[in-house]
Amino acid sequence: MSFKREGDDQSQLNILKKRRVSDLLSNFIPDDEATLMKNGRYSCLVCSHRPVFDTVDMLVVHRKGKRHLEGMKWFYGKKNQLRREIDKRRHQDYVKAEDDRQEPSSSAPLLTQTRKITHHALLRTVPYSSCHKKASERSESSSKEHRNDLANSHLSMRTESNDSRTTVHQGPSEVKGEAKKKKKGASTLSSSVCEPLTEQRRRELDHYLKLKSSGWLQDRSGKWVKDENVEFDSDEEEPTLLPPCSESS
């Protein structure tokens, strides 16, 4: 039989709720399988039609019935499915967070590009790239060859100048000996152009240095062209040629 409360005293209602909760705990009924309603009755949360009982004893008898046991299978099957779905979502979120940590951030492409440039700069050899364009390779190689030709021509002129200075101080026999030793070395100008030979070399060196200081550059074919970074006073398209040496009497 059910307990009926008389009056509206809040203390009596609290005492009644406390006693009914104690009854639930004493019968080992989980909180997610039954609940205490506001009117003091018990409701079964396992069954889909939510039956209501006046006392705990009636709820215990209902829980032993066949219909309730079938409902428990469906109830816990649904609960386990929900738990597996939650675990699956958590695992997916965890994997996604780990992938985002490992991959570089797309919000900072400049930082990523800077790291790649720094990495390639520290390498001893240039890494192979199948996407590298052949035209760029040709332009880079031609520019390197142009710079190497300019450096070699300047070095050869300096070598010729040093040879001309040492030749002035040496005697005729020493000059012949040095000429035989350096016969396979740097190319020399023909002695039939003008006399003496050392004076012609010095004039060519002075002319070369004068053109370089004026802003002229020598390309691979030996032609003089204007430097784009230098301002010229006149509109001359070609530099002044080296005047021929006057014949000695």
Curated annotation (Swiss-Prot):
Q: Where is the composition biased (Acidic residues)?
A: 230-239
Q: Where in the cell is it found?
A: Nucleus, Nucleoplasm; Nucleus speckle
* Motif residue range(s): Bipartite nuclear localization signal: 4-20
- What are the protein's UniProt keywords? Metal-binding, mRNA processing, mRNA splicing, Nucleus, Spliceosome, Zinc, Zinc-finger
Question: Basic and acidic residues: which segments have biased composition?
Answer: 94-103, 134-149
**Where is composition skewed (Polar residues) in this entry?**
104-115, 150-170
Instruction: Please give the InterPro entries that the UniProt record associates with this protein.
Output: SCNM1, SCNM1_acidic, Znf-SCNM1
GO cellular component terms given for this protein: nuclear speck; nucleus; spliceosomal complex
Task: Report the record's disulfide bonds.
Answer: none
GO aspect biological process, one term: alternative mRNA splicing, via spliceosome
Q: Where is this region: Disordered?
A: 94-116, 128-199, 228-249
Q: Which GO molecular function annotations are given, in alphabetical order?
A: zinc ion binding
List residue spans of Matrin-type Zn fingers: 42-74
Describe its function.
Answer: As a component of the minor spliceosome, involved in the splicing of U12-type introns in pre-mRNAs.
Quaternary structure per UniProt? Answer: Component of the minor spliceosome, which splices U12-type introns.
Q: What is this protein called?
A: Sodium channel modifier 1
The beginning of the lineage is:
Eukaryota, Metazoa, Chordata, Craniata, Vertebrata
Gene name for this UniProt entry: scnm1
